[in-house]
């Protein structure tokens, strides 16, 4: 909305020297990509020494949530419209519910494949949040073992990931 009004998006913003960048958002609908692309350009112009972070959905989100007919289109539209130097996402493949366990690895590897291909084709880095804890949100995620954490890291690196990240949620 502020972008459409044409005002100074950063008028009340003071970048702190200790902060390397900012977050644009998390898991956007593809309909936001045009605005995000413009925001990225303006941010880079105003703060050339900082970087703007965003994080996409992994494969498995519905077409309605993605705003695209499938995951490959969702990622391709991001690459086309948002001038980020990387594609970042979170992928949590270990579930405590049996039904989800069967599809989780296929979705995980599909995510890695789509994003890695898009990164290679566009010259971007592949960044990944991987699963290091369980039982948050709605208790569907399993606590991964050391071997499962290692598998995620090695699999992501095999697909060309350049940055591996994790989060820690606490009550």
Please annotate each region the language model reported.
Residues 1-171:
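Glycan-processing catalytic domains of CAZymes
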């Amino acid at each position: 909305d502020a972008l459409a009004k044409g005002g100074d998006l950063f008028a009340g913003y003071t970048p702190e020297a200790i902060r390397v960048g900012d977050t644009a958002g998390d898991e956007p609908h593809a309909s936001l990509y045009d605005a995000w692309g413009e925001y990225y350009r303006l941010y880079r112009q105003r703060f050339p020494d900082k970087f703007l972070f965003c994080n996409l959905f992994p494969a498995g989100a519905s077409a309605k949530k993605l705003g695209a007919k499938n995951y490959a289109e969702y990622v391709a539209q991001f690459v086309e419209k948002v001038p980020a130097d990387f594609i970042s996402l979170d992928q949590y493949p270990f579930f405590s519910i049996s039904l989800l366990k069967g599809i989780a690895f296929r979705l995980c590897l599909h995510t890695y494949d789509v994003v890695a291909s898009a990164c290679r084709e566009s010259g971007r880095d592949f960044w990944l949040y991987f699963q290091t804890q369980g039982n948050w949100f709605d208790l569907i995620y399993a606590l991964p073992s050391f071997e499962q954490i290692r598998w995620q890291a090695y699999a992501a690196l095999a697909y060309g990931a350049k940055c591996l990240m994790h989060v820690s949620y606490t009550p």
